[in-house]
Amino acid sequence: MAEKKVFLFRSMASVIDQALLSGLNLLIGLALIRYASKETYGLYTQLFAAGLLTTILLDSLIGSALTTLSARLPADERGRFVARAAKIHWVASALLAIPAGLVVGVLAKLLDFPVSPVVLGLSFSSFVFAQASREYCRTALFIESQAVAVAKMDMVFVLVTIAGAAAFFMVGDIGTPHIFFLLTIANVVASAAFSSTLWRSTGRDIKWGQYLADVNVLWSLSRWAVIGSVVGWLGNNSYLYFSGAIAGVVALADLNAARLLLMPIVIVGMAWTTLARPAMGEMIANSKIHKLRQFVLKSTLAMESFNLIYLGGLFVVYPWLIAHLFGEKYGDISNLILLWACYFAVNTARNVSTILLITYGIFRELFWQ
């Protein structure tokens, strides 16, 4: 009974945490829908998705393998391993952030974006590194089952972002580089304290050979997870670039507006994922296979039930949303909402099986998902 209460408490903290983050993304999206042109909103979603890819790559490269391995280690050894992996993660983040910023800057020049290519590239590069650093802190805290600490850190991130956005609105328009610089500052402020703790926890007597050994251990598990994550990202986000290239960013804005209304489904799925990985890892480590099966089945049924209930409620308030929020420029997007709902129903079941494979350490099969 006590174990169930603890898991329920962590679940609520995780849901609140994801609600904060997704709510922030929702506010940004709604503000762009309401006050910006379709072209601006469409381009923003493409660039933000590219930033998301780098975070996913780092999580699959280090975070997923770290979660799997940590469940099998004693507490003291786990803490040292997580701290050493933090430095590996920071180096990998920099190696991804720098070329990502260069690519964005070059594309901004070639495609004649109405912003400075240098400023846009710098803002994007700094955002990628800062976002990745905070995501690692979240992973490390979840490994230690500190869901409340994660929620507090993300609360700081949300508050700093909102305060900065309010300041920008007071002085004038917000451009894309301003948004990424603001998110960089918010990520740094939120994760600075725990990042400092991780840095000090490694000590000064760690040899390079130890880091190389850790890299080899992580890579032995994560190399297939990286491929699987890239395939998963393409499945979730390739429409941004194909639809933008074929139908234009105006049509892309309609697609994203419909998807934005289903954000609560994403919130629940992400909250479950962050909690399920360490919980399932513990079940596997203790050979509680029957309990694991029940957990997977009940999780799938619960999330699919939520999907149906939310979709029904959404269509009840849909006329009001169109009239008072989206306006005439978006028109009727109900068919797009239904198509997205079908996609999320299938993706929910796929996500459960993906996390199960990751937790087992069976990363190669992820490639075929």
What is the role of each PLM region?
Residues 5-64, 101, 162, 223-250, ...:
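Signature of the first transmembrane helix
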Residues 38, 107-123, 315-345:
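Interfacial segments at transmembrane-helix termini and the short loops linking adjacent helices
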Residues 58-75, 143, 258, 262-287, ...:
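Helix-loop junctions and terminal segments of transmembrane helices
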Residues 118-125, 151-202:
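Hydrophobic alpha-helical transmembrane segments
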